């Protein structure tokens, strides 16, 4: 068994955990998530811990399953969040309930549809906060927004993650 899979996932008292056939249902204060587990992995709940047992040939999948379960439990209890910042003169963002409008140096504003289960806030014109209960979905939406105008290496203009360090290149010299 992998090192990751050997650690149990801790459940808090406000989280409901249920396994039916191969589908895992986790419900918490922020919402509910479902996950279809692989056939060769068996999930057992004892008190407030989730353990898994596996056959020897599927150790990699057991570690992945444990990580996905942990992300689901954390998502329905605390939620996930990614922060983006806009760097550049005149770059700004404005969020409504259904769309995010980005002005990032193109001749037109870029409209980004907000998927279901994701909330996007703009505390200031140059900050975007993406939050939700599904870690994969939050990360994918953040990557999609960043891909509208990724940071360029000479001046650092573009949309970047809040904690991302842009390594700047030196301009050509004659």
Q: What are the functions of these language-model segments?
A:
Residues 2-143, 147-161, 165-174:
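N-terminal intrinsically disordered, cationic/polar leader segments
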